[in-house]
Amino acid sequence: MATLHIEHPISDLPASLGAFSRFREARRRAVVRAERVLHPVDDDKYIYVSLDFDSVEQAEAFQNFLEANVWTSREASPALAGTPRARVLTDVDSASAP
């Protein structure tokens, strides 16, 4: 499994969540297995997104899609308030709490 971890400043949380929702079908086509959207408890102008994929290649392909089609468009990402930082991560160790 691979996770595409994204973080960036936003101008408005509801607008950011709305933009995220509009790309639900793109995430489905990219075979996103799980997704999480978070923001710091003390900063509603910053957002973190984690998207899980079956492979590193799928995660990298979706990152390329975001970089080429979403983050470059004000219409597609109206709440984006800075440069997104995205990295593909893989598990090296994990466990569930008892």
Where are these regions (language model features)?
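An amphipathic, aromatic/His-enriched active-site/gating alpha helix that lines ligand/cofactor pockets
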Residues: 18-36, 52-87
